[in-house]
Curated annotation (Swiss-Prot):
Residues covered by region (Disordered): 1-34
Protein name: Nucleoid-associated protein GWCH70_0020
Entries under SUPFAM superfamilies matching the protein: YbaB-like
Location of this chain's protein in the cell: Cytoplasm, Nucleoid
Low complexity composition-biased segments: 9-18
Gene3D superfamilies: Nucleoid-associated protein YbaB-like domain
Subunit structure: Homodimer.
Its biological purpose: Binds to DNA and alters its conformation. May be involved in regulation of gene expression, nucleoid organization and DNA protection.
InterPro entries assigned: YbaB-like_sf, YbaB/EbfC
Gene Ontology cellular component list: bacterial nucleoid; cytosol
Family the entry assigns: Belongs to the YbaB/EbfC family.
Main location: cytoplasm
Length: 108
């Protein structure tokens, strides 16, 4: 009886190691994937990776008004939040396969 228990334990450990490697690979892929957040009808674009690192900010010339810096700040903020939301969704989609069936609040 002990022998079967040990075999199951080894099998479980191997499955866990495999899953851990797959999760690590998915994390690496997240770093390479990008998402784009926009605001003002595309006047401001923010590009982030799946790890929520901002990689690029693009601002169209037409939206730059020295008399209204606050509007530009709002657009940059909105585009950044849009990009970060999309990065969260991407991470949840990619990592969700590993947490399927587990109900761990706040994990992804």
């Amino acid at each position: 009886m002990m022998r079967g228990g040990m075999g199951n334990m080894q099998k479980m450990m191997k499955q866990m190691q495999k899953m851990q490697k797959e999760m690590q690979k998915a994390q690496e892929q997240l770093a390479e994937k990008t998402v784009e957040g926009t605001a003002g009808g595309g006047m401001v674009t923010v590009i982030a990776n799946g790890h929520k690192q901002i990689l690029e900010v693009k601002i169209k010339e037409e939206v730059v008004d020295p008399e209204d810096i606050e509007m530009l700040q709002d657009l940059v903020l909105a585009a950044t939040n849009d990009a970060l939301k999309k990065a969260d969704e991407l991470a949840a989609e990619m990592m969700g396969q590993f947490t399927k069936g587990l109900n761990i609040p706040g994990l992804f």
